[in-house]
Protein backbone atom coordinates (compact mmCIF):
# COMPACT_ATOMS: atom_id res chain seq x y z
CA UNK A 1 0.00 0.00 0.00
CA UNK A 2 1.37 3.40 -0.97
CA UNK A 3 2.06 6.07 1.60
CA UNK A 4 -0.17 9.11 1.78
CA UNK A 5 1.20 12.21 0.01
CA UNK A 6 1.30 15.45 1.98
CA UNK A 7 2.73 18.93 2.00
CA UNK A 8 5.52 19.30 2.79
CA UNK A 9 6.44 16.44 0.49
CA UNK A 10 9.71 15.63 2.30
CA UNK A 11 9.98 14.60 5.97
CA UNK A 12 8.94 17.35 8.38
CA UNK A 13 12.49 17.62 9.72
CA UNK A 14 13.98 18.45 6.30
CA UNK A 15 14.37 22.04 5.11
CA UNK A 16 14.99 22.32 1.37
CA UNK A 17 13.69 25.54 -0.19
CA UNK A 18 14.29 26.92 -3.71
CA UNK A 19 13.49 23.58 -5.31
CA UNK A 20 14.38 22.87 -8.92
CA UNK A 21 12.61 19.60 -9.83
CA UNK A 22 13.76 17.47 -12.77
CA UNK A 23 12.92 14.05 -14.15
CA UNK A 24 15.96 11.95 -15.02
CA UNK A 25 15.76 8.24 -15.85
CA UNK A 26 12.33 7.68 -14.35
CA UNK A 27 12.92 9.55 -11.10
CA UNK A 28 12.11 13.06 -9.91
CA UNK A 29 15.17 14.78 -8.41
CA UNK A 30 14.97 17.82 -6.16
CA UNK A 31 17.84 20.32 -6.18
CA UNK A 32 17.58 23.20 -3.75
CA UNK A 33 19.43 25.14 -1.15
CA UNK A 34 19.48 23.70 2.35
CA UNK A 35 18.25 25.60 5.37
CA UNK A 36 19.03 24.70 8.95
CA UNK A 37 16.37 24.21 11.61
CA UNK A 38 16.85 27.05 14.11
CA UNK A 39 19.32 28.57 11.67
CA UNK A 40 20.22 32.26 11.97
CA UNK A 41 20.63 32.85 8.21
CA UNK A 42 19.58 31.42 4.85
CA UNK A 43 21.07 28.25 3.38
CA UNK A 44 23.51 27.26 6.12
CA UNK A 45 23.78 23.58 5.19
CA UNK A 46 25.42 21.74 2.29
CA UNK A 47 23.48 20.66 -0.78
CA UNK A 48 21.62 17.38 -0.45
CA UNK A 49 19.34 15.68 -2.94
CA UNK A 50 16.10 13.72 -2.64
CA UNK A 51 14.41 11.71 -5.37
CA UNK A 52 11.24 9.71 -5.95
CA UNK A 53 10.00 7.38 -8.70
CA UNK A 54 7.76 9.21 -11.17
CA UNK A 55 4.94 6.75 -10.49
CA UNK A 56 5.00 7.11 -6.68
CA UNK A 57 5.58 10.59 -5.30
CA UNK A 58 5.17 9.33 -1.74
CA UNK A 59 8.44 7.36 -1.82
CA UNK A 60 11.10 10.04 -1.43
CA UNK A 61 14.64 8.73 -1.05
CA UNK A 62 17.50 10.62 0.55
CA UNK A 63 20.42 10.65 -1.88
CA UNK A 64 22.87 12.22 0.56
CA UNK A 65 25.16 15.23 0.36
CA UNK A 66 25.93 16.01 -3.28
CA UNK A 67 28.12 19.10 -2.79
CA UNK A 68 29.74 20.83 0.16
CA UNK A 69 30.25 24.57 0.54
CA UNK A 70 33.98 23.97 1.07
CA UNK A 71 34.25 22.28 -2.35
CA UNK A 72 34.41 25.71 -4.01
CA UNK A 73 37.97 27.13 -4.19
CA UNK A 74 36.64 30.55 -3.14
CA UNK A 75 35.26 29.08 0.09
CA UNK A 76 37.85 26.75 1.68
CA UNK A 77 36.84 27.68 5.24
CA UNK A 78 33.11 27.44 4.56
CA UNK A 79 32.32 30.98 5.65
CA UNK A 80 30.05 31.52 2.64
CA UNK A 81 26.72 29.75 2.12
CA UNK A 82 25.52 27.87 -0.93
CA UNK A 83 22.57 29.80 -2.32
CA UNK A 84 19.84 28.46 -4.62
CA UNK A 85 21.25 26.14 -7.35
CA UNK A 86 20.06 24.68 -10.62
CA UNK A 87 21.08 21.63 -12.64
CA UNK A 88 21.18 20.90 -16.36
CA UNK A 89 22.20 17.94 -18.49
CA UNK A 90 25.10 19.05 -20.67
CA UNK A 91 25.75 18.06 -24.29
CA UNK A 92 28.39 15.61 -23.04
CA UNK A 93 25.81 13.70 -20.97
CA UNK A 94 27.08 14.97 -17.63
CA UNK A 95 25.09 16.88 -15.03
CA UNK A 96 26.11 20.47 -14.31
CA UNK A 97 25.28 22.22 -11.04
CA UNK A 98 25.18 26.05 -11.15
CA UNK A 99 25.20 28.08 -7.94
CA UNK A 100 26.29 31.32 -6.28
CA UNK A 101 28.04 31.73 -2.95
CA UNK A 102 26.45 34.36 -0.75
CA UNK A 103 29.24 36.96 -0.74
CA UNK A 104 30.61 36.91 -4.29
CA UNK A 105 29.03 38.09 -7.59
CA UNK A 106 30.05 35.13 -9.76
CA UNK A 107 28.44 31.86 -10.86
CA UNK A 108 30.21 28.64 -9.88
CA UNK A 109 29.74 25.32 -11.66
CA UNK A 110 30.20 21.73 -10.46
CA UNK A 111 29.79 18.54 -12.49
CA UNK A 112 28.84 14.91 -11.94
CA UNK A 113 28.30 11.81 -14.09
CA UNK A 114 25.01 10.99 -12.34
CA UNK A 115 22.08 13.14 -11.17
CA UNK A 116 22.71 12.71 -7.44
CA UNK A 117 26.32 11.65 -7.09
CA UNK A 118 29.21 13.64 -5.64
CA UNK A 119 29.54 16.79 -7.71
CA UNK A 120 33.05 18.14 -8.25
CA UNK A 121 33.98 21.77 -8.78
CA UNK A 122 34.30 22.53 -12.48
CA UNK A 123 34.87 26.26 -12.90
CA UNK A 124 33.34 29.74 -13.00
CA UNK A 125 31.16 31.22 -15.72
CA UNK A 126 33.45 33.58 -17.63
CA UNK A 127 33.84 35.73 -20.67
CA UNK A 128 36.09 34.58 -23.51
CA UNK A 129 38.99 36.63 -22.08
CA UNK A 130 38.74 34.74 -18.78
CA UNK A 131 37.05 37.50 -16.76
CA UNK A 132 34.39 35.99 -14.54
CA UNK A 133 30.81 37.00 -15.29
CA UNK A 134 29.78 39.46 -12.60
CA UNK A 135 33.29 40.90 -12.09
CA UNK A 136 33.77 42.90 -15.28
CA UNK A 137 33.24 46.64 -14.94
CA UNK A 138 29.57 47.36 -15.53
CA UNK A 139 28.42 43.83 -14.71
CA UNK A 140 25.57 43.31 -12.29
CA UNK A 141 26.15 40.74 -9.54
CA UNK A 142 25.01 37.25 -10.44
CA UNK A 143 22.39 35.60 -8.24
CA UNK A 144 20.05 32.57 -8.25
CA UNK A 145 21.28 30.94 -11.48
CA UNK A 146 18.79 28.99 -13.59
CA UNK A 147 19.87 26.99 -16.63
CA UNK A 148 18.42 25.33 -19.71
CA UNK A 149 20.57 23.47 -22.25
CA UNK A 150 19.51 23.08 -25.88
CA UNK A 151 22.07 21.46 -28.13
CA UNK A 152 25.43 23.18 -27.70
CA UNK A 153 23.96 26.27 -26.00
CA UNK A 154 23.09 26.73 -22.35
CA UNK A 155 20.84 29.61 -21.35
CA UNK A 156 21.74 31.09 -17.96
CA UNK A 157 19.22 33.27 -16.11
CA UNK A 158 20.25 35.33 -13.08
CA UNK A 159 19.33 38.40 -11.08
CA UNK A 160 18.41 40.05 -7.80
CA UNK A 161 16.41 43.28 -7.95
CA UNK A 162 15.00 44.64 -4.68
CA UNK A 163 12.07 47.00 -5.02
CA UNK A 164 13.20 50.57 -5.64
CA UNK A 165 16.80 49.65 -6.51
CA UNK A 166 17.53 51.60 -9.69
CA UNK A 167 20.99 50.03 -10.02
CA UNK A 168 19.44 46.70 -11.10
CA UNK A 169 17.33 46.69 -14.27
CA UNK A 170 15.90 43.17 -14.18
CA UNK A 171 16.40 39.46 -14.76
CA UNK A 172 19.29 38.66 -17.09
CA UNK A 173 19.73 35.97 -19.73
CA UNK A 174 23.23 34.96 -20.81
CA UNK A 175 24.17 32.31 -23.37
CA UNK A 176 27.01 29.86 -22.67
CA UNK A 177 28.92 27.69 -25.11
CA UNK A 178 29.38 23.90 -25.13
CA UNK A 179 32.01 24.00 -22.37
CA UNK A 180 29.17 25.13 -20.04
CA UNK A 181 31.30 28.04 -18.78
CA UNK A 182 32.18 30.48 -21.57
CA UNK A 183 29.83 33.34 -22.42
CA UNK A 184 28.98 33.40 -26.14
CA UNK A 185 26.15 35.96 -25.87
CA UNK A 186 26.38 38.65 -23.20
CA UNK A 187 23.63 39.31 -20.64
CA UNK A 188 20.37 40.92 -21.75
CA UNK A 189 17.39 41.98 -19.63
CA UNK A 190 14.31 39.81 -20.17
CA UNK A 191 11.99 40.83 -17.28
CA UNK A 192 12.11 44.31 -15.71
CA UNK A 193 12.78 45.30 -12.14
CA UNK A 194 10.30 47.58 -10.38
CA UNK A 195 11.86 50.97 -11.29
CA UNK A 196 11.86 50.06 -15.00
CA UNK A 197 8.50 48.30 -15.41
CA UNK A 198 6.23 51.11 -16.56
CA UNK A 199 4.29 50.05 -19.64
CA UNK A 200 5.80 46.55 -19.62
CA UNK A 201 2.78 44.58 -18.42
CA UNK A 202 4.75 43.44 -15.36
CA UNK A 203 3.59 46.29 -13.11
CA UNK A 204 2.96 45.04 -9.57
CA UNK A 205 4.67 41.74 -10.35
CA UNK A 206 8.14 42.90 -11.34
CA UNK A 207 11.18 40.65 -11.07
CA UNK A 208 12.77 40.33 -7.64
CA UNK A 209 14.72 37.04 -7.59
CA UNK A 210 14.42 33.25 -8.00
CA UNK A 211 14.59 32.84 -11.79
CA UNK A 212 13.78 29.42 -13.21
CA UNK A 213 13.29 28.29 -16.79
CA UNK A 214 11.28 25.51 -18.41
CA UNK A 215 10.11 24.73 -21.94
CA UNK A 216 6.82 23.18 -23.00
CA UNK A 217 6.48 22.62 -26.72
CA UNK A 218 7.82 25.76 -28.37
CA UNK A 219 7.09 28.00 -25.37
CA UNK A 220 9.64 29.06 -22.77
CA UNK A 221 8.29 29.57 -19.25
CA UNK A 222 10.28 31.94 -17.06
CA UNK A 223 9.27 31.44 -13.42
CA UNK A 224 10.35 34.01 -10.84
CA UNK A 225 9.60 35.60 -7.48
CA UNK A 226 8.09 39.06 -7.78
CA UNK A 227 8.80 42.15 -5.68
CA UNK A 228 6.12 41.12 -3.17
CA UNK A 229 8.21 37.98 -2.52
CA UNK A 230 5.46 35.53 -1.56
CA UNK A 231 4.33 34.75 -5.11
CA UNK A 232 5.84 32.76 -7.95
CA UNK A 233 4.94 34.35 -11.27
CA UNK A 234 5.56 33.30 -14.83
CA UNK A 235 6.26 34.92 -18.18
CA UNK A 236 6.29 33.26 -21.58
CA UNK A 237 8.09 33.68 -24.88
CA UNK A 238 8.83 31.77 -28.06
CA UNK A 239 12.51 32.78 -27.69
CA UNK A 240 14.78 32.03 -24.71
CA UNK A 241 16.36 35.50 -24.42
CA UNK A 242 13.71 37.99 -25.53
CA UNK A 243 10.02 38.69 -25.91
CA UNK A 244 8.80 37.53 -22.50
CA UNK A 245 5.24 38.60 -21.60
CA UNK A 246 3.78 38.52 -18.11
CA UNK A 247 1.50 35.53 -17.57
CA UNK A 248 0.30 35.61 -13.98
CA UNK A 249 0.79 34.16 -10.51
CA UNK A 250 1.14 30.38 -10.18
CA UNK A 251 1.21 30.14 -6.38
CA UNK A 252 1.53 32.39 -3.34
CA UNK A 253 2.92 31.01 -0.09
CA UNK A 254 0.33 32.98 1.86
CA UNK A 255 -2.47 32.16 -0.63
CA UNK A 256 -2.98 35.79 -1.60
CA UNK A 257 -5.13 36.43 -4.71
CA UNK A 258 -7.06 33.18 -4.24
CA UNK A 259 -10.78 33.95 -3.82
CA UNK A 260 -12.32 30.49 -4.03
CA UNK A 261 -12.71 30.11 -0.27
CA UNK A 262 -11.92 33.55 1.21
CA UNK A 263 -11.47 37.21 0.18
CA UNK A 264 -8.76 37.43 -2.47
CA UNK A 265 -6.39 39.62 -0.49
CA UNK A 266 -6.73 37.82 2.84
CA UNK A 267 -3.50 35.98 3.75
CA UNK A 268 -4.00 32.44 5.05
CA UNK A 269 -0.41 31.52 5.97
CA UNK A 270 2.62 33.51 7.07
CA UNK A 271 4.43 34.11 3.80
CA UNK A 272 7.85 35.31 2.78
CA UNK A 273 10.28 34.84 -0.05
CA UNK A 274 9.44 32.12 -2.54
CA UNK A 275 11.40 30.13 -5.11
CA UNK A 276 10.63 27.06 -7.17
CA UNK A 277 9.62 25.83 -10.59
CA UNK A 278 7.29 23.69 -12.65
CA UNK A 279 7.86 20.17 -13.92
CA UNK A 280 5.96 17.53 -15.87
CA UNK A 281 5.72 14.15 -14.11
CA UNK A 282 3.89 11.28 -15.78
CA UNK A 283 1.89 13.65 -17.96
CA UNK A 284 0.86 15.94 -15.08
CA UNK A 285 2.33 19.35 -14.28
CA UNK A 286 3.29 20.52 -10.80
CA UNK A 287 4.57 23.68 -9.16
CA UNK A 288 7.24 23.31 -6.47
CA UNK A 289 7.57 26.18 -3.98
CA UNK A 290 8.42 26.67 -0.32
CA UNK A 291 6.76 27.72 2.91
CA UNK A 292 8.22 29.38 6.01
CA UNK A 293 8.33 27.67 9.41
CA UNK A 294 9.62 28.22 12.94
CA UNK A 295 8.62 31.90 12.99
CA UNK A 296 11.58 32.76 10.75
CA UNK A 297 12.60 33.01 7.12
CA UNK A 298 15.54 30.68 7.70
CA UNK A 299 13.78 27.30 8.06
CA UNK A 300 11.90 26.87 4.80
CA UNK A 301 10.28 23.67 3.54
CA UNK A 302 9.37 22.46 0.08
CA UNK A 303 5.75 22.06 -0.99
CA UNK A 304 4.14 21.14 -4.30
CA UNK A 305 0.76 21.48 -5.98
CA UNK A 306 -0.71 20.09 -9.17
CA UNK A 307 -1.26 22.78 -11.83
CA UNK A 308 -2.95 22.95 -15.21
CA UNK A 309 -1.37 24.48 -18.29
CA UNK A 310 -4.33 25.47 -20.44
CA UNK A 311 -4.50 25.26 -24.23
CA UNK A 312 -3.55 28.94 -24.54
CA UNK A 313 -0.45 28.30 -22.40
CA UNK A 314 -1.75 30.07 -19.32
CA UNK A 315 -1.44 28.67 -15.79
CA UNK A 316 -4.26 29.50 -13.34
CA UNK A 317 -3.14 30.18 -9.78
CA UNK A 318 -3.51 27.22 -7.41
CA UNK A 319 -4.31 27.07 -3.70
CA UNK A 320 -1.87 25.92 -1.08
CA UNK A 321 -3.12 22.55 0.14
CA UNK A 322 -2.21 19.78 2.56
CA UNK A 323 -2.69 17.20 -0.20
CA UNK A 324 0.38 18.17 -2.22
CA UNK A 325 0.77 15.86 -5.19
CA UNK A 326 -2.12 13.59 -4.18
CA UNK A 327 -4.66 12.95 -6.93
CA UNK A 328 -7.58 12.78 -4.49
CA UNK A 329 -8.57 14.48 -1.23
CA UNK A 330 -7.13 12.93 1.92
CA UNK A 331 -9.21 10.09 3.42
CA UNK A 332 -11.58 11.41 6.08
CA UNK A 333 -10.44 8.99 8.76
CA UNK A 334 -7.39 8.31 10.89
CA UNK A 335 -4.66 10.46 12.39
CA UNK A 336 -2.97 13.35 10.58
CA UNK A 337 0.08 15.35 11.70
CA UNK A 338 -0.52 19.03 12.38
CA UNK A 339 2.55 20.07 10.38
CA UNK A 340 0.61 19.49 7.13
CA UNK A 341 -1.43 22.64 7.83
CA UNK A 342 -1.71 24.74 4.68
CA UNK A 343 -3.48 27.61 6.44
CA UNK A 344 -2.14 29.13 9.65
CA UNK A 345 -3.20 32.50 11.01
CA UNK A 346 -4.63 34.36 13.99
CA UNK A 347 -6.75 37.43 14.65
CA UNK A 348 -3.81 39.70 13.88
CA UNK A 349 -3.55 39.45 10.11
CA UNK A 350 -0.15 39.40 8.38
CA UNK A 351 1.11 38.55 4.91
CA UNK A 352 4.63 37.88 6.14
CA UNK A 353 6.24 35.49 8.60
CA UNK A 354 7.95 38.12 10.70
CA UNK A 355 7.29 41.86 10.79
CA UNK A 356 9.74 42.53 13.61
CA UNK A 357 12.98 41.27 12.07
CA UNK A 358 13.44 39.04 15.10
CA UNK A 359 14.99 35.62 14.82
CA UNK A 360 12.40 32.90 15.49
CA UNK A 361 9.57 35.33 16.14
CA UNK A 362 6.83 34.23 18.57
CA UNK A 363 4.30 36.81 17.43
CA UNK A 364 2.28 34.26 15.46
CA UNK A 365 1.53 30.52 15.52
CA UNK A 366 4.25 28.55 13.76
CA UNK A 367 5.17 25.10 12.52
CA UNK A 368 8.27 23.85 14.33
CA UNK A 369 9.89 20.71 15.78
CA UNK A 370 11.73 19.57 18.87
CA UNK A 371 15.44 18.79 18.94
CA UNK A 372 18.20 20.23 16.81
CA UNK A 373 18.80 20.38 13.07
CA UNK A 374 19.02 16.90 11.61
CA UNK A 375 17.07 15.23 14.41
CA UNK A 376 14.25 13.23 12.88
CA UNK A 377 11.64 14.80 15.13
CA UNK A 378 8.11 15.22 13.73
CA UNK A 379 6.84 18.72 13.22
CA UNK A 380 3.94 20.32 15.09
CA UNK A 381 2.24 23.71 15.48
CA UNK A 382 3.38 25.83 18.42
CA UNK A 383 2.32 29.18 19.89
CA UNK A 384 -1.40 28.75 19.29
CA UNK A 385 -2.81 31.59 21.37
CA UNK A 386 -6.42 32.76 21.43
CA UNK A 387 -7.79 33.00 17.84
CA UNK A 388 -4.93 30.98 16.30
CA UNK A 389 -6.28 28.81 13.49
CA UNK A 390 -4.78 25.88 11.59
CA UNK A 391 -6.42 24.80 8.34
CA UNK A 392 -6.05 21.55 6.42
CA UNK A 393 -7.27 20.90 2.85
CA UNK A 394 -8.96 18.71 1.68
CA UNK A 395 -10.64 15.62 3.17
CA UNK A 396 -13.19 13.19 1.79
CA UNK A 397 -15.39 12.98 4.87
CA UNK A 398 -17.74 10.03 5.37
CA UNK A 399 -19.40 9.15 8.64
CA UNK A 400 -17.09 11.14 10.93
CA UNK A 401 -18.58 11.07 14.42
CA UNK A 402 -15.82 12.41 16.66
CA UNK A 403 -12.48 14.22 16.56
CA UNK A 404 -9.40 13.74 18.73
CA UNK A 405 -6.43 16.10 19.05
CA UNK A 406 -3.01 15.79 20.70
CA UNK A 407 -2.06 18.96 22.55
CA UNK A 408 0.47 20.16 25.08
CA UNK A 409 1.30 23.50 26.63
CA UNK A 410 0.26 26.06 29.21
CA UNK A 411 -3.28 26.41 27.94
CA UNK A 412 -6.87 26.21 29.09
CA UNK A 413 -9.69 26.55 26.61
CA UNK A 414 -11.20 24.82 23.60
CA UNK A 415 -10.37 23.99 20.02
CA UNK A 416 -13.25 24.84 17.71
CA UNK A 417 -13.69 22.56 14.71
CA UNK A 418 -15.06 23.99 11.43
CA UNK A 419 -15.12 23.12 7.74
CA UNK A 420 -14.41 26.69 6.61
CA UNK A 421 -12.20 29.35 8.14
CA UNK A 422 -15.13 31.59 9.10
CA UNK A 423 -17.89 29.00 9.12
CA UNK A 424 -20.15 27.40 11.68
CA UNK A 425 -18.48 25.82 14.69
CA UNK A 426 -19.36 22.14 14.45
CA UNK A 427 -18.04 21.33 17.89
CA UNK A 428 -15.52 22.19 20.59
CA UNK A 429 -12.77 20.09 22.14
CA UNK A 430 -11.85 21.21 25.69
CA UNK A 431 -8.11 21.25 26.48
CA UNK A 432 -6.09 22.01 29.59
CA UNK A 433 -2.50 22.36 30.70
CA UNK A 434 -0.20 19.42 30.02
CA UNK A 435 3.57 19.32 29.65
CA UNK A 436 3.39 16.12 27.59
CA UNK A 437 1.38 15.35 24.48
CA UNK A 438 -2.12 14.55 25.70
CA UNK A 439 -5.12 13.40 23.71
CA UNK A 440 -8.41 15.26 24.05
CA UNK A 441 -11.59 14.39 22.18
CA UNK A 442 -15.21 15.33 21.61
CA UNK A 443 -18.21 14.04 19.73
CA UNK A 444 -18.23 16.21 16.60
CA UNK A 445 -20.15 14.90 13.59
CA UNK A 446 -18.75 16.30 10.35
CA UNK A 447 -20.99 16.41 7.28
CA UNK A 448 -20.22 13.96 4.51
CA UNK A 449 -18.47 15.42 1.49
CA UNK A 450 -15.17 17.00 0.54
CA UNK A 451 -14.23 19.60 3.13
CA UNK A 452 -11.41 21.59 4.60
CA UNK A 453 -10.91 21.29 8.35
CA UNK A 454 -10.06 24.22 10.61
CA UNK A 455 -9.03 24.12 14.27
CA UNK A 456 -9.24 27.43 16.16
CA UNK A 457 -7.95 27.79 19.71
CA UNK A 458 -10.05 29.86 22.11
CA UNK A 459 -8.74 30.33 25.60
CA UNK A 460 -5.82 31.40 27.76
CA UNK A 461 -2.15 30.60 27.44
CA UNK A 462 -0.49 28.99 24.45
CA UNK A 463 -1.18 25.54 23.01
CA UNK A 464 0.85 23.29 20.74
CA UNK A 465 -0.99 20.97 18.33
CA UNK A 466 0.68 17.72 17.28
CA UNK A 467 -2.07 15.89 15.40
CA UNK A 468 -5.77 15.31 14.95
CA UNK A 469 -7.72 12.10 14.41
CA UNK A 470 -10.98 11.71 12.51
CA UNK A 471 -13.05 8.89 13.99
CA UNK A 472 -15.92 7.05 12.32
CA UNK A 473 -16.91 4.93 15.32
Swiss-Prot record:
An example Gene Ontology molecular-function term: alpha-L-arabinofuranosidase activity
Site (Important for catalytic activity, responsible for pKa modulation of the active site Glu and correct orientation of both the proton donor and substrate): 144
Keywords, alphabetical: Carbohydrate metabolism, Glycosidase, Hydrolase, Multifunctional enzyme, Polysaccharide degradation, Xylan degradation
Catalytic activity: Hydrolysis of (1->4)-beta-D-xylans, to remove successive D-xylose residues from the non-reducing termini; Hydrolysis of terminal non-reducing alpha-L-arabinofuranoside residues in alpha-L-arabinosides
GO biological processes: xylan catabolic process
Pfam families assigned: Glyco_hydro_43
Catalytic activity, EC: 3.2.1.37, 3.2.1.55
Keyword Amino-acid biosynthesis in record: no
Residues the record marks as active site: 18, 209
SUPFAM superfamilies: Arabinanase/levansucrase/invertase
Subunit note: Homotetramer.
Family in the record: Belongs to the glycosyl hydrolase 43 family.
Protein name according to UniProt: Xylosidase/arabinosidase
Amino acid sequence: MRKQRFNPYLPSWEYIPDAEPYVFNGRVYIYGSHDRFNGHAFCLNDYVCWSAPVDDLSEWRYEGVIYRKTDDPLNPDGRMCLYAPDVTLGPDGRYYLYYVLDKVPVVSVAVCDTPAGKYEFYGYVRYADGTRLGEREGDWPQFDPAVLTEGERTYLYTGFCPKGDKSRKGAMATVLGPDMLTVVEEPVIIVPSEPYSRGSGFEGHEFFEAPSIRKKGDTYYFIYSSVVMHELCYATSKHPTKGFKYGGVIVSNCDLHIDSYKPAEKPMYYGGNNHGSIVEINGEWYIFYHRHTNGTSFSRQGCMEKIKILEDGSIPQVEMTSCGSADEPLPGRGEYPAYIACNLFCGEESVYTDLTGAWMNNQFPKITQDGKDGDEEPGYIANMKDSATAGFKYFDCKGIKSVKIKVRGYCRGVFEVKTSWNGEVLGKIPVEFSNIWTEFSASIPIPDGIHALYFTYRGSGSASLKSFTLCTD
